[in-house]
Amino acid sequence: MPMLPPVANALKRSETGAEETSEQDAVKRTKVLDMAQKVTRQIISSANAPGAIGPYSQAVRAGNTIYLSGSLGLDPKTGDLKEGVVEQTHQSLKNLGEVLKAAGADYGNVVKTTVLLQNIADFAAVNEVYGQYFKSPYPARAAYQVAALPKGGLVEIEAVAIAGEIEEVKN
């Protein structure tokens, strides 16, 4: 019998529990699994946010999930960093907002962010600005101090969002 992916191996037995032996059945099953696993991929970009400064996209939508690359506090018109961590945080989040808009989403669609800080002592100042863009229920988040950020940035924020209408479920 041909080697199948782990998911297909789990489906190797018939409803009665007897193992299927037909190679044709295995091929059919593999084709069905391949069709179920296909996901559309779309590159998202906005002229209203700074272009990528390396070989990557501003965002990629895979199925209903939108992955936004890290955003520095760069002015989209000049490419210059804003002054100070507060202004860089505002600009980083504005840039993310423009890319979200290009994807047909907004801050309410964001489910996860990662905040990279050049200095963890800026955590409170970044939180103050962050709370102006994201409202409760807040996205999941991680924040880290890093040794350095591109272009001498003080903060970089990346995000993951879900396309479409979000229905909140109360616990």
Swiss-Prot record:
Q: Enumerate the Pfam families for this protein.
A: Ribonuc_L-PSP
Citing just one GO molecular function, the answer is: deaminase activity
Instruction: Cite a GO CC annotation.
Output: mitochondrion
* Record InterPro entries: RidA, RidA_CS, RutC-like_sf, YjgF/YER057c/UK114
Q: Where is this region: Disordered?
A: 1-25
Q: Which family does it belong to?
A: Belongs to the RutC family.
Q: What is this protein called?
A: RutC family protein C23G10.2
Native source species: Caenorhabditis elegans
